[in-house]
Amino acid sequence: MKHKIAILSDIHGNATALEAVIADAKNQGVSEYWLLGDIFLPGPGASDLVALLKDLPITASVRGNWDDCVLEALDGEYGLEDPQEIQSMRMTQFLMERMDPATIVWLRSLPLLQKKEVAGLRFSISHNLPDKNYGGDLLVGNDTEKFDQLLDEETDVAVYGHVHKQLLRYGSQGQQIINPGSIGMPYFNWEALKNHRAQYAVIEVEDGELVNILFRKVAYDYEAELELAKFKGLPFIEMYEELRREDNYQGHNLKLLANLIEKHGYVEDVKNFLEAIKSEYKMD
């Protein structure tokens, strides 16, 4: 029996890109989907994005670091001193105004690691490391010993996301490692390789063998995605516009964040949000 699996990662709120990827995956004859986390933000996708995912036969899901940021914001773990924390809270406020709180219950339930066996082939599925969904341990240029952290004697193939780059390599003992790239915000270091396409991967397993690994880059209307973000009133829209048009996201530019926070009065919005989550969103 042949299993054709689409590996989806790092959607980051880009429902327009996700829709294009799903259409492409169906054309590829995919029978199931694995979801590697970082589902929401900084893009505007909320309930519309969830609706797309609910229609898919998803057989494995793990939680990413941006998913944890949403949960931490809802749990009141952030304050008003750090521009990145203010951004996370304002973006989470935007998200929760457009999404069923039941989605947060589902998000909390997702593990960091999931193991799957497909026709006798053993897979490890994580957003980043099996026990750590953040950090730079698995950047594509790192040494093999770093990637060995994904592997154990019961893993034939490890798949992970997080670094927003498609990757195919091996561990020191020969196990396969796959990164499908990012659907919503791919990263590029080399200018000539920049493009506006959504990335994902398709793997084919037949009779216990990994017979095909296909990296896909799918064109979509990124200007329509940007217009949708503007129509919805996405906070920090200036940063999203640069991401969509220039493939550059300045999430670590504290000066830029501080300027935008002051320009749009986001601190007051966040203060109101902090009051609201004490009773409305926080879940035990």
Where are these regions (language model features)?
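Beta-strand-turn-beta hairpins that frame and shape the catalytic cleft
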Residues: 1-6, 115-124, 172-176, 209-212
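N-terminal active-site segment of His-dependent metallophosphoesterases
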Residues: 1-56
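Active-site neighborhood of phospho(di)ester-bond hydrolases with catalytic His/Asp-centered motifs
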Residues: 7-9, 33-38, 42, 60-65, ...
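Active-site environment of divalent metal-dependent phosphoester hydrolases
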Residues: 12-17, 41-44, 66-71, 159-171, ...
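Metal-dependent catalytic neighborhoods of phosphoester/phosphodiester hydrolases
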Residues: 39-56, 71-81, 169-172
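Active-site neighborhood of divalent metal-dependent phosphoester bond hydrolases
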Residues: 56-114, 123, 141-154
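Acidic, His/Gly-rich catalytic cores of divalent-metal-dependent hydrolytic chemistry
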Residues: 174-284
